[in-house]
Swiss-Prot record:
The keyword Coiled coil applies. Keywords: Chromosome, Coiled coil, Phosphoprotein. The modification Phosphoserine is found at residues 19, 233. The gene is CCDC137. Residues 7-20 have a biased composition (Low complexity). It comes from Homo sapiens (Human). Residues 273-289 have a biased composition (Basic and acidic residues). GO terms for cellular component: chromosome; nucleolus; nucleoplasm; nucleus. The keyword Phosphoprotein applies. Residues 162-177 have a biased composition (Basic residues). It is found in: Chromosome. This is Coiled-coil domain-containing protein 137.
Amino acid sequence: MAGAGRGAAVSRVQAGPGSPRRARGRQQVQPLGKQRPAPWPGLRSKEKKKVNCKPKNQDEQEIPFRLREIMRSRQEMKNPISNKKRKKAAQVTFRKTLEKEAKGEEPDIAVPKFKQRKGESDGAYIHRMQQEAQHVLFLSKNQAIRQPEVQAAPKEKSEQKKAKKAFQKRRLDKVRRKKEEKAADRLEQELLRDTVKFGEVVLQPPELTARPQRSVSKDQPGRRSQMLRMLLSPGGVSQPLTASLARQRIVEEERERAVQAYRALKQRQQQLHGERPHLTSRKKPEPQL
């Protein structure tokens, strides 16, 4: 024990503070969690080559990546067929999925293929295999009862023809309805359009005869209904209604009484002014009422 300790001390003194053996020992004492993996020797050189690569030919210059992407996107925008094809393919895939769901056909359960991944420990690999196996067993137990030997009865040709005819009829009805709507719109546009002949002269703007429902009618100057205009217009004077005999007799009596009262008033005025009595006996014309 003492010899071993003395030998270690001698070796420590011989090594010295700056010897490479001591530095190597310190590197070995470092914990494993703080070690950094050394970079690959050719990695940085490749990166430098990628960044600072020179053109192969000085007379030719390659198109930048961004510019190539812009050119490709412009070409796709100019070609509308590609967008239509993508939409059509998506519609077909969606239709097939719906048909499979409607038929109730379930796909076969995929058998997992086990392969240990890079950097995966044995315990993690075994745990992953167990989980996938349990998942496959769960799916197989809960799967619906399948009878592959029983084939579905093919549809009769008459049913297929009926379905085809019904589809064609619906399509034709839809086309006919669209044509009728277009014709109605065209007719409405033609009715709203005024055709002006060549050389036609318009002296005044058109008169609007239709009035809104809640509008208040106001008389415009020059168009007011005047009494004089009504009287002068032919047929404007209203004809008196034919009165009965009793009504005519009452009117005659009232007129005679008014005439007698007027005569008495005039005679009284003459007496007050001292006129001669023979003038009062002169017959005067009756006033016309």
